[in-house]
Amino acid sequence: MFASSYVELLELTQRIMDDDGPKAKADAIIMYGQTKDNEDSIFLGVKRLYEKNLAERVVFGQGGKLVTRQDYLPDYQTKLIQLGIPSEAIIPLQITEALAHTHTEALAHIAHAKMRQWKNVYVVASPFHQLRAFVNTVSIVLRQYPELKVFSVLGTHLPWMDKAIHSQNVESGKRFELIQNEWKRIEAYHAKGDLVSARQVLDYLNQRDQ
């Protein structure tokens, strides 16, 4: 099981949803991709951080295929520039040549952070995706670059009762209905070995903040 108790899961969820921030300006904002129905959440979350001068740059992933076999080539750079983020502060990363998903995004982001020797980064995803995105990120950090300090910031709120397409454009429902499958994915990917446990993420947060 991903979490050993409801209390452990509740603690982790609350800390991810209301995380501390780094003491210094972050090296980057890692932006996890979303469908068009939900992408305003991540764009506005990233814009808010950047406008507050809390990070040097924004990183997003592209490349590979969706499960529908469509190329994953989001037009995020254009949209970030339209939001006022300068092009020189935007880094598009090739995340994979195979299947593009949250885990391959995390692998690419942390490999790039390690190459650049970044010290602090923010992770931004839509609220119902944030838990899985952050746990994926920390899982890769612990295995490949444990010196990196990763901080969680939610994308902006979107109405929970609105219908939206999610997860590679193949899942739809009201946004609150998408949470159940997010949890199922966390359990499945933990059982597969892709994700560390809730306890390991909490231990990472405690060590990060010492």
Give the positions of each predicted feature.
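A conserved mid-domain beta-alpha-beta active-site/ligand-binding segment of alpha/beta enzyme cores
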Residues: 96, 163-210
